[in-house]
């Protein structure tokens, strides 16, 4: 089984995407600026993806739309989704976790801790995939 090493980073602000790309420079990265583009990139690269880093508030399609798509199509168990958003209301947090998000990370964030949290959960998903195969 090939090791997945590609992140899909989805945020409408280029600066946020660049900061996360720089943080995860040891991995391949695919970027998307809205939810619709995220779904297109996800479908194209789903067998390579180790995680999706997903903003909530975006034009065209928001992050919840992407998360719902992943749940509907059965992808949520294979690829961890991290919500990275300034919207940390109880309603948004509940919705994210209810839909199967692996973690919710509030903006602004400490990049060192975000890297550690994301890498730890990616490793757990990798181990789970390995045990299932």
Q: What role is predicted for each listed range?
A:
Residues 47-50, 74-80:
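His-Asp phosphorelay/catalytic-motif detector in bacterial-type signaling
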Residues 31-51:
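Acidic, metal-coordinating helix/loop segments flanking the phosphotransfer/catalytic sites
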Residues 91, 109-118:
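C-terminal output helix
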Residues 14-31:
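Two-component/phosphorelay signaling modules centered on CheY-like receiver
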Residues 58:
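Receiver (REC) domain active-site loop signature in two-component systems and cognate sites
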């Amino acid at each position: 089984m090939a090791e997945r090493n590609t992140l899909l980073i989805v945020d409408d602000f280029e600066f946020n995407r660049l900061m996360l790309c720089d943080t995860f420079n040891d991995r391949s990265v695919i970027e998307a600026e809205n939810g619709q583009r995220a779904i297109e990139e996800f479908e194209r690269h789903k067998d390579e993806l180790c995680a999706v880093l997903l903003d909530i508030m975006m034009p065209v399609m928001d992050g919840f739309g992407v998360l719902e798509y992943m749940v509907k199509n059965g992808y949520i168990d294979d690829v961890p989704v991290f919500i990275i958003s300034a919207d940390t209301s109880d309603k948004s947090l509940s919705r994210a976790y209810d839909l199967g998000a692996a973690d919710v990370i509030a903006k602004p964030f400490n990049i060192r801790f975000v890297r550690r949290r994301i890498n730890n959960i990616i490793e757990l998903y990798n181990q789970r995939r390995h045990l299932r195969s």
